[in-house]
A protein has these predicted regions:
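N-terminal secretory signal peptides that target proteins for export/translocation
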Residues: 1-5
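Bacterial N-terminal signal peptides
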Residues: 8-20
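C-terminal/domain-edge helix-coil "capping" segments
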Residues: 25-39, 55-58, 62-67, 96-101, ...
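Short, well-ordered secondary-structure micro-motifs
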Residues: 41-42, 83-85, 119
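Glycine- and acidic-residue-enriched helix-capping/strand-helix junction motifs
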Residues: 42-54
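Generic, well-ordered alpha-helical segments
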Residues: 51, 55, 86-89
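Short, solvent-exposed, polar/charged sequence segments at loop or secondary-structure edges
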Residues: 65-108
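Hydrophobic residues positioned within well-ordered beta-strands of beta-sheet architectures
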Residues: 107, 121-122
């Protein structure tokens, strides 16, 4: 094959492959910070805010690693993120922020602390265009420690994120 023809064939192949990669890009996700819904009656631990921030970072990294979502930067919207709280019971107050950030989905995580031993962790993935639940990852965690939170996040992403994106239990935080 003449080198000019080979160069054109390779150029077309590269363009087509690049288009396939672009077409399969992961949806942009507004990953909101973890919140605590504490019904334990216990005094909050001094490291709670750091633990919630760490859990949010672990969630962002774990979701990116799956290739299913690409996190958008919510930093420029920090005051709006703070005002849209508590997200686990505000209806869809977080959706305008997600849309402003250019996200296709909003990811809303919460830890419901029942006691220092028992908590539940929920992560809702919500379609930013219409507020419909895309998926719900939920489970129990044991312990009120950074290690328990990290393990809980990794477990939920690894074992509860459905392959087809259908709701695991259907419920959105409303």
């Amino acid at each position: 094959m003449p080198s000019g023809v080979l160069a054109r064939v390779l150029a077309v192949a590269i363009v087509l492959m690049g288009g396939a990669v672009a077409a399969s890009a992961a949806p942009a996700a507004a990953i909101f910070p973890f919140e605590i819904y504490d019904t334990s009656g216990e005094a909050p631990q001094s490291d709670l805010n750091e633990r919630l921030a760490m859990a949010t970072q672990v969630l962002s990294e774990a979701l990116e690693k799956t290739g299913r979502y690409s996190a958008v930067d919510l930093g420029p919207f920090s005051s709006e993120v703070a005002a849209a709280a508590p997200r686990y019971r505000c209806g869809d107050c977080f959706l305008p922020v997600a849309r402003k950030a250019g996200a296709a989905v909003a990811i809303v995580p919460v830890v419901h602390k029942v006691s220092s031993l028992i908590s539940s962790m929920d992560i809702w993935i919500i379609d930013a265009s219409n507020g419909a639940a895309v998926a719900h990852l939920g489970g129990q965690i044991r312990g009120d420690t950074a290690q328990a939170y990290e393990h809980g996040v990794r477990f939920l992403v690894r074992n509860r994120l459905t392959e087809d994106g259908s709701p695991a239990d259907g419920a959105a935080p409303k």
